C-alpha cells in the first residue's frame, strides 16, 4: 500500500492529543535503494537519520520543528530503526512501520509481536518498490496474505491513480 506521510502523521498526532495513546513510535528498516551508503559516522540518531527523514519531514510539516524536537526529547515521539525493536513491548503507542516492503518475513513477525496493550500499528509500504535482495520475500507481501480476513486487521490498497504527485513525476 502507499500512503500520504502528512495524513498518517496527522492521525498519529490526533490519537496522541485525544489520549488514545501515550506516544508515537516511528519505525523503518534501514534498506538502501540501489546505491550503497557505506559506513556512516556519528551516534545512532545520526546513522539512521537518512532512512527516517521522510517521517521527520511529515511531522515537521504538521507540528513545526521546535515542537517535534521537544516531543522527541521527552520520548513522546520515538524514531527507531527496525533492527532495534527486538525484545521491546510497545504499550499505549501509535506505531508506524514505514517502507514495510523492505522488511523480511522474520522482521515483520518481530515487529508485529512488539505490539502491547492499547497500541495500534500502521504498516505502510509499496510492494512494487521492494529493495531487498532478489531471493528474499517481502515481509509486507507475506503478512498481507496471512492476515487477510483476520478480525481487527484491515488493509487498504491504493492504485497509481490514487497517488497524487506533481505531473513531472
Predicted regions and their residues:
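Conserved helicase motor core of SF1/SF2 NTP-dependent helicases
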Residues: 1-97, 101-168
Amino acid at each position: 500500500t502507499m500512503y500520504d506521510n502528512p495524513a498518517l502523521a496527522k492521525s498519529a498526532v490526533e490519537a496522541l492529543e485525544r489520549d488514545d495513546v501515550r506516544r508515537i513510535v516511528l519505525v523503518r528498516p534501514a534498506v538502501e535503494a540501489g546505491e550503497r551508503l557505506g559506513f556512516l559516522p556519528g551516534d545512532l540518531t545520526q546513522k539512521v537519520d537518512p532512512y527516517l527523514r521522510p517521517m521527520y519531514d511529515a511531522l515537521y510539516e504538521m507540528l513545526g520543528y521546535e515542537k517535534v524536537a521537544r516531543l522527541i526529547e521527552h520520548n513522546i515521539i520515538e524514531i527507531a530503526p527496525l533492527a532495534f525493536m527486538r525484545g521491546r513491548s510497545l504499550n499505549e503507542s501509535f506505531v508506524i512501520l514505514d517502507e514495510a516492503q523492505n522488511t523480511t518475513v522474520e522482521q515483520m513477525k518481530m515487529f508485529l509481536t512488539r505490539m502491547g496493550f492499547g497500541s495500534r500499528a500502521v504498516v505502510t509500504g509499496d510492494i512494487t518498490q521492494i529493495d531487498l535482495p532478489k531471493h528474499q520475500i517481502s515481509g509486507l507481501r507475506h503478512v498481507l496474505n496471512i492476515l487477510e480476513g483476520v478480525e481487527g486487521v484491515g488493509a487498504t490498497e491504493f492504485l497509481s491513480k490514487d497517488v497524487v504527485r506533481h505531473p513531472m513525476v
